[in-house]
């Protein structure tokens, strides 16, 4: 039997990246959630070739302190929690501290960031987990991540990616879900130099629905706004005239986090079963506000189940 040995940190990060980053859409999700946690009111997502050659995400959030930049790319480095007890009440979208180290281990990454108090910004380039550049530059407040050549050093994993069009579709779905869950943030999505999504950030969910799904959907909605001592439910459901042959029209959020729940889906679909044809599913965009102490967001790797 071969001698047992301890893996080097870069190899550990590449293995771990497989659990966090499986395609370009995973990178977009993680970096958009970072931007939201940083207090951004504007997020721009630009991709080329389905995100395989370029992902650029720019926000106007608080930026990253100079002394924290290199630390942020270490595995399990996070500002969101300090101990396991903090998982009980964590409200941020990200908290595990795995995303940046995972992305940097399998991509070529350039970070440009500036905080409000800093005189200059910082550019940090890291490729395959190895530092290339760390320098001061002029930059606006906020953060830009430029991610190139996903899986450039793990070609076997790159072969499992779909076509550029399919990968772009996965990214578009992520951007749509985040835009629906945060109508107070202006979000734009640019695919191969063409703007596909742009929301104003005016806080009006119906405007976001119109922007993503179009006039026919937006004009056939019923508003939901109800609450009790445990939960507040807001959003929109579609009239019977709009339905689809799969659940892609169903959007559910808990405290602004997109989730998948067979229990919620089944309950909503049961309410429609006498007004929709068989094998048709309704449009929904519903947010549930619940006491954070009653939730466990750490039960699913992608944090999509609670």
Language-model segments: which ranges?
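N-terminal phosphate-binding caps/lids of nucleotide- and nucleic-acid-binding domains
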Residues: 1-306
């Amino acid at each position: 039997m071969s001698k047992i040995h301890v893996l080097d940190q870069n190899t550990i990060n590449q293995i771990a990246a497989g659990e966090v980053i499986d395609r370009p859409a995973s990178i977009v999700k993680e970096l958009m959630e970072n931007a939201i946690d940083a207090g951004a009111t504007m997020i721009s997502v630009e991709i080329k070739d389905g995100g395989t050659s370029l992902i650029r995400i720019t926000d106007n959030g608080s930026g990253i302190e100079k002394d924290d930049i290199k630390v942020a790319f270490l595995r399990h480095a996070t500002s969101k929690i300090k101990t396991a007890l903090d998982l009980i009440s964590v409200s941020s979208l990200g908290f595990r501290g795995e995303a940046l180290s995972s992305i940097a281990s399998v991509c070529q990454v350039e970070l440009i960031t500036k905080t409000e108090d800093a005189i200059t910004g910082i550019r940090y380039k890291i490729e395959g987990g190895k530092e290339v550049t760390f320098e001061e530059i002029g930059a606006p407040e906020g953060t830009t991540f430029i991610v190139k050549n996903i899986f450039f050093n793990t070609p076997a994993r790159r072969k499992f990616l779909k076509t550029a069009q399919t990968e772009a579709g996965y990214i578009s779905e992520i951007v749509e879900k985040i835009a629906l869950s945060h109508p107070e943030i202006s979000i734009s999505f640019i695919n191969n130099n063409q703007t596909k999504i742009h929301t104003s950030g005016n806080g009006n969910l119906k405007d976001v629905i119109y922007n993503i799904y179009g006039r026919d959907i937006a004009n056939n909605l019923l508003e939901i706004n109800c609450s009790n001592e445990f939960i507040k439910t807001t959003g929109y459901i579609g009239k019977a005239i709009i339905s689809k042959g799969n659940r892609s029209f169903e959007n559910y959020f808990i405290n602004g986090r997109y989730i998948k729940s067979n229990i919620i889906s089944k309950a909503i679909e049961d309410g429609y079963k006498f007004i929709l044809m068989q094998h048709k599913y309704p449009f929904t965009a519903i947010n549930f506000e619940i006491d954070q102490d009653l939730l466990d967001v750490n039960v699913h790797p992608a944090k999509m189940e609670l």
